[in-house]
Amino acid sequence: ALDNVIDLNYYPTPYAKVTNKKYRAIGLGTSGYHHMLVKNDIKWSEEDAHLDFVDKVYEDINYFAIKASNELAKEKGSYSCFEGSDWDNGDYFKQRGYESERWEKLKDQVHQNGLRNGYLLAVAPTGSTSIISGTSAGVDPIMNKYFLEEKKGAIVPRVAPGLNTKTFWLYENAYTIDQNISMRACGARQRHIDQAQSVNVYITTEYTMRQILNIYLTAWEAGVKSLYYVRGKSLEVEDCDSCAS
């Protein structure tokens, strides 16, 4: 479906049309990241378990995305600049350390049959669509177990997905999580994402400029391509229960 949009889409400028047809880039993304961790009994701050788990998950996502694009290439042909690309010569796979048997087979299939799309994965914020699907937004932690959020002029009550007596203790507030762990998790995912991720940084008024700079340096060291918003909040301001009702 995403590939078909390229041919059916309306392009406001000819340059966008030329580029889209040339590389056939799509932006296959994910949502419900924090929800997924909690469903697998992993707390965000449990760094080793967290990073190991998502490294495997996003490797699988990338593998099946490439495989699907390879199958499309057999049917419809490769994107026009495939020949001589990192996909064609195998550098894409070498750069990411994809050396297992299944990856070697896929690398050979891509070389032989091509790839329909030059770019595959990109993680969007999914702030609104996650509400519809009943999960957490994008790859961000939840802001609280229950809170009010403004969406297009309306106040929407939000409750952490799947909240119960067990998951209550697994969910962690975005503003109390060590942001350096979030950046390293972002780096673990980035290895498998050829484009970028919409990742927010959550800070409190107690943060110093040095701490904020260190978060950005951690992101850079982890290989993160880009960050989204820096969201600030004072932890001393408590939500009013009567106002919330």
Language model features with spans:
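Glycine-centered flexibility sites
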Residues: 27-34, 41, 77, 127, ...
